């Protein structure tokens, strides 16, 4: 079990008087992550974002294909009809047997910043991002949202898992450019056919991590 995961890090921030009032679950699927975190953060307001049009949830839910541009036409790939695979839908087609039938719908994208402005949403303190390869694109379209954010947990590819999707280094660079530093890990996905293909990394805003740990007195890499 990974000790320094998002639960540990959120507790660390709370013990240092940082508040987590607004949480964005981007790539919410059926809302399981939010259900779990509502137990950890009962006072917080959760906002769920899911691109798959077949999924409808109650509450603060937005069915939108987030990206780095508004009104960009993209193909949104869906799993094969012959299986009940619950996740993986994306405008970057998953490179697996579950997506061999090339099923897709035509959709238009929206920047997270635009959606926030259009709906007068509060800016997030904590973001979970799991969107099957489009995470870097969404971050590029969220420059205003990231200004107030304290923690991001983001799924990142180790091996190419979605066709033509940005790679690990690009995601790290975008987050670094927005003053986020890797601080922990939620999950290592190495269970499918012996391949280590994905990792969920927890990032913390640089100034917060510096205030709590004074990391720059030791580590000069960031």
For each of these PLM feature ranges, what is it?
Residues 1-222:
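Phosphate/nucleotide-binding beta-alpha loop and adjacent structural elements of enzyme active sites
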């Amino acid at each position: 079990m990974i000790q320094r995961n998002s639960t540990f890090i959120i507790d660390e921030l709370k013990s240092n008087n940082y508040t987590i009032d607004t949480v964005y679950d981007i790539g919410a699927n059926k809302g399981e992550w939010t259900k779990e975190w509502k137990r950890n953060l009962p006072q917080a307001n959760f906002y769920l974002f899911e691109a798959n049009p077949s999924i409808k949830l109650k509450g603060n839910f937005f069915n939108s294909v987030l990206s780095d541009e508004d009104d960009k036409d993209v193909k949104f790939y869906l799993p094969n009809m012959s299986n009940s695979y619950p996740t993986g839908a994306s405008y970057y087609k998953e490179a697996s047997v579950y997506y061999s039938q090339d099923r897709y719908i035509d959709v238009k994208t929206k920047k997270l910043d635009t959606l926030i402005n259009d709906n007068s949403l509060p800016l997030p303190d904590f973001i979970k991002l799991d969107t099957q390869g489009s995470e870097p694109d969404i971050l590029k379209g969220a420059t205003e949202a990231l200004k107030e954010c304290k923690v991001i947990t983001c799924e990142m590819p180790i091996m190419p898992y979605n066709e033509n999707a940005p790679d690990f280094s690009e995601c790290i660079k975008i987050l670094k450019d927005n003053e986020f530093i890797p601080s922990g890990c939620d999950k290592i996905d190495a269970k499918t056919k012996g391949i280590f293909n994905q990792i969920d990394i927890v990032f913390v805003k640089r100034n917060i991590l510096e205030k709590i740990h004074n990391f720059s007195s030791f580590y000069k890499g960031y």
